[in-house]
């Protein structure tokens, strides 16, 4: 029988306190209201979601995994349902800039939530990071047409980002990787 997952909320909050993150971040105008009053309930809600929704489906990710058929990737239905709840709850965009529809919280806050999500279910927890990378690339380097087309769906969690490694001869060319 598996041991029930218990999110490390107290440890994460302790980490924020030890590095004095509230006072450090309060010096930045965008985070002047950042406090324990925001962090504690955020971590508690993330823990509740992770303990109740993500941890119970962790084994399914290992046992069933993702499949690809005719160019379409399919996840276990439990992962699809969990991701919908994740996106609807705003976890997908908690630290994204508010001017593109995100929560505008400091990335240190999403660091704590990502730790909770990932320790409950690593296969699930990896997805938000890939989306954040795609969102950042488009937001900082995309033209307005690309931003208008992709950012709303990525920020809302309707779409997810992917990892694309394709630089030939520069260390991330997956086609040339071999194993022993």
Where are the regions that the model predicts?
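Amphipathic, small/basic residue-rich leader segments at the start of a protein or domain
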Residues: 1-126, 145, 149
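Residue-level "edge-of-site" marker
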Residues: 99, 130, 167
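Glycine-rich, Trp-frequent "lid" loop and neighboring beta-strands that shape
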Residues: 95, 103, 145-180
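Structured loops at beta-to-helix junctions and adjacent beta-edge loops in soluble globular domains
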Residues: 19, 141, 166-168
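Contiguous, well-ordered alpha-helical segments that form the cores/surfaces of helical PPI scaffolds
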Residues: 111-115, 132-139, 163
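Short glycine/threonine-rich loop-to-helix capping motif typified by GTGT followed
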Residues: 107-108, 141-142, 176
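N-terminal glycine-rich flavin-associated loop
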Residues: 126-144, 171
């Amino acid at each position: 029988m598996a041991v029930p997952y218990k999110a490390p909320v107290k440890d994460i909050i302790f980490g924020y306190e030890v590095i004095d993150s509230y006072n450090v971040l309060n010096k930045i105008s965008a985070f002047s209201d950042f406090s324990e009053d925001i962090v504690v309930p955020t971590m508690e809600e993330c823990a509740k979601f992770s303990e109740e929704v993500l941890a119970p489906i962790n084994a399914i990710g290992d046992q069933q995994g993702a499949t690809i058929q005719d160019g379409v990737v399919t996840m276990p239905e439990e992962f699809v349902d969990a991701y919908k709840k994740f996106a609807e709850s705003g976890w997908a965009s908690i630290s994204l800039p508010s001017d593109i529809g995100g929560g505008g919280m400091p990335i240190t806050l999403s660091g704590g939530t990502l730790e909770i999500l990932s320790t409950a279910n690593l296969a699930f927890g990896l997805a938000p990071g890939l989306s954040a990378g795609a969102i950042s690339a488009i937001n900082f380097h995309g033209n307005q047409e690309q931003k208008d087309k992709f950012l709303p769906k990525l920020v809302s969690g309707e779409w997810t980002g992917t990892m694309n490694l394709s630089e030939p001869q520069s260390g991330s060319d997956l086609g040339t990787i071999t194993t022993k």
